[in-house]
Amino acid sequence: MTNIRKAHPLIKIINNSFIDLPTPSNISSWWNFGSLLGICLILQILTGLFLAMHYTSDTMTAFSSVTHICRDVNYGWLIRYMHANGASMFFICLFLHVGRGLYYGSYMFKETWNIGVLLLFAVMATAFMGYVLPWGQMSFWGATVITNLLSAIPYIGTDLVEWIWGGFSVDKATLTRLFAFHFILPFIVAALAGVHLLFLHETGSNNPSGLPSDSDKIPFHPYYTIKDILGALIMLLALLSLTLFSPDLLGDPDNYIPANPLNTPPHIKPEWYFLFAYAILRSIPNKLGGVLALVLSILVLALMPLLHTSKQRTMMFRPISQCLFWLLVADLFTLTWIGGQPVEHPFIIIGQLASILYFALILVLMPIASLLENNLLKW
């Protein structure tokens, strides 16, 4: 008789994805972040569900309801801070996952990569909407500034912004709809993640060498299940340490002040994981130009398969590309730092130079370096 895990229509899918899946024998810890992102998503959906039970999406009571969750609900403070810091862990894993993809040429799986870029946009949209919900000063002004960017779209911009606001400013209607979207989007993200995996399992995983690994595959279970559990434990340890020892480390103190449309905070800035994109937005003096640069800073990832000029898939054996990759990482750290600084000298010029370098590295320098390395192979 055939084993039930190989015969049952539902269990068969799980078996082929997590148990009998043929996996390259040499994938490193950089391949752990997919499973960590899955755990993050499940954690966010669960904590978010319990928060939604006590949260009210009304401008008069939203701030108070979050305070009520932290003070009066059993372990409400833990659920709230796990959710807030869980978002930070989510983005740390996302950035490392995308970085791995860039370094090891995983973008050559075009469908998987494009769904991944779509997922990145969806998660960023979800996180932005979630930041608005506590209805503190930074929530309100962040929502006002970011939604206002759409007014840069020619002709329809202003109408579009007022349509999204549900009025002539960020108000009750805006908060209610953002809560609705914040609730539904993670489930769309989960569905997209399923499609992401579906396309990945069509081709099989890449590996650090970038060479075909069909001749050397091992079953996912027990080798990589154990490895993923170790990764998950390390991530959960980091998340719990952050949540229990310094829950407000990555937050903004201004968000503990209830939203006040009559009082603008001195520095409006988003959460840390958006600061690099925010710095690129601010580095262009023109509104429409800034918005385009903001979108392109993420959308440029979709061009990676077209910009791949190397004869080798990964950067493992390409020292010049490696140097440029780590320069890109340093540049992103610089942009993140600049995004949190006030708009004044010398931060303006540093931000502009870092933004130019960001696009130059991805669009010009890395493809040229790859061509150079192709020629070096002939020596």
Curated annotation (Swiss-Prot):
GO process terms (BP): mitochondrial electron transport, ubiquinol to cytochrome c
Binding-site positions, heme b b562: 83, 182
Binding site for a ubiquinone: 201
Residues where heme b b566 binds: 97, 196
Cofactor: heme b
Location, primary (coarse class): mitochondrion
Subcellular location: Mitochondrion inner membrane
Keyword annotations of the record: Electron transport, Heme, Iron, Membrane, Metal-binding, Mitochondrion, Mitochondrion inner membrane, Respiratory chain, Transmembrane, Transmembrane helix, Transport, Ubiquinone
Transmembrane stretches, start-end: 33-53, 77-98, 113-133, 178-198, 226-246, 288-308, 320-340, 347-367
GO molecular function: metal ion binding; ubiquinol-cytochrome-c reductase activity
UniProt entry tagged with the keyword Hydrolase: no
Membrane disposition: Multi-pass membrane protein
General remark: Heme 1 (or BL or b562) is low-potential and absorbs at about 562 nm, and heme 2 (or BH or b566) is high-potential and absorbs at about 566 nm.
Subunit structure: The cytochrome bc1 complex contains 11 subunits: 3 respiratory subunits (MT-CYB, CYC1 and UQCRFS1), 2 core proteins (UQCRC1 and UQCRC2) and 6 low-molecular weight proteins (UQCRH/QCR6, UQCRB/QCR7, UQCRQ/QCR8, UQCR10/QCR9, UQCR11/QCR10 and a cleavage product of UQCRFS1). This cytochrome bc1 complex then forms a dimer.
Function: Component of the ubiquinol-cytochrome c reductase complex (complex III or cytochrome b-c1 complex) that is part of the mitochondrial respiratory chain. The b-c1 complex mediates electron transfer from ubiquinol to cytochrome c. Contributes to the generation of a proton gradient across the mitochondrial membrane that is then used for ATP synthesis.
Entry protein name: Cytochrome b
Gene: MT-CYB
